């Protein structure tokens, strides 16, 4: 920048920009870093110089020692120069930081500028009959002085800082430590593009293209009509838009020999479409319909040819990588199948046995097997030992089945389910023991009247009681065991109250002046048992035919 530019801005702008910046702190920190780097370079150079001096002094004799010293000499010189450059860079940055501090000290502050504006306003407000003309002129001249001072300060700061940055030395890359006459290492990887070019030249395709196709392309490209049309933005567009151009040996060698990866594929296509977009924009900007039409045609051919060439290179590279990875991937793919190939003979026989199921296709289905009667589950309430049942077991008649195989295993009865009997819930229904004794007496009387079975069915009927006696004998002691309800339950004594008519409900009905009469008769209405808890409940359900009419109270 020049002084007039700084002079064109008011001092408030320069003061605000200079005072609101980061200050000289970052420059001083950077200068300290360059000083440290210079010291590190110097220490490394001293160490290497001492090592080379020891080699020359006789630690390592022979011609190889001289070669070793000669190989390290350029690197030693670079270390010394890098140390000097780093020190110079630190000095330049310190100079720029000092210039910044000087400019900040010489720049009028925002407070001074604000005070000048405030004083100018007061003088203008109190300037009656021009009495403040001289103070106003002095204040304005002071503001002009600050304006010039700010511009001069910025110009000086720019000159010093620019010179410091421009004079900063640049360090070159470190030289390699190699033998002076060492041959250049040849690349181990062959150039496939060059190999394809040599093959195309060997078969004569290169000569045919150079002698026949390329002259024709050049003639089309150099047509005055096309040259005048595209000379303004892309004179090579007629050549790139010619499909014969993509048949050149260089393009074929690129498609078949360049190792294309996904990133390069995307980068090449992006670059091509960027060029095509620029050509289309220039053609539409010209406004010439012929230019737009030819540009669309040529760019379409260029896009198709580039996509085909790059896609061939990408597919070829992916196929080569896949074939190279197959030897390493086959063991990984075969690892899950190894247990099947190394399975023991027993496992193989198990799989081979499944083949016998194929012979069952032609065998007719057999009759369903007859399931023998399942033994009834024993009741959980303890009962006395029953007498033999008179009824013989029914004989199941089954249809004959062909001898196709071993008979199915017999179905065995499930084991009797044992659990807490109803006596454990005596607190819900009272006098369970008496009810059990009554049922025992009734059951015994009924079974005593059963006629004896015939002699032919006697063994079968005699075996039935034995099967029922054992569960009952095992369940009988459970009544007296712990956790059976009677251990911690106190039953209320039987009061023996007779059931009476309920005083609740509709109340006394009839004519006025009638009285309540309780007379024996047929039970009707609502019947309750007064003062009844659990102990005085009926032992058997009351049915209409067994109601006790004497103990009921009729509500009339």
UniProtKB/Swiss-Prot annotation:
Segments of this protein annotated with the region Leucine zipper motif: 319-340
Residue numbers spanned by region SH3-like: 201-256
GO cellular component: extracellular region; host cell cytoplasm; host cell nucleus
Main location: secreted
Subcellular location: Secreted; Host cytoplasm; Host nucleus
Bias type Pro residues, positions: 400-417
Gene3D superfamilies: PPE superfamily
Written domain comment of the UniProt record: Contains a conserved PPE N-terminal domain and a variable C-terminal domain. The C-terminal region includes a SH3-like region, a leucine zipper DNA-binding motif and a functional nuclear localization signal (NLS).
PANTHER family registered for this protein in UniProt: GLUTAMINE-RICH PROTEIN 2
This protein's name: PPE family protein PPE2
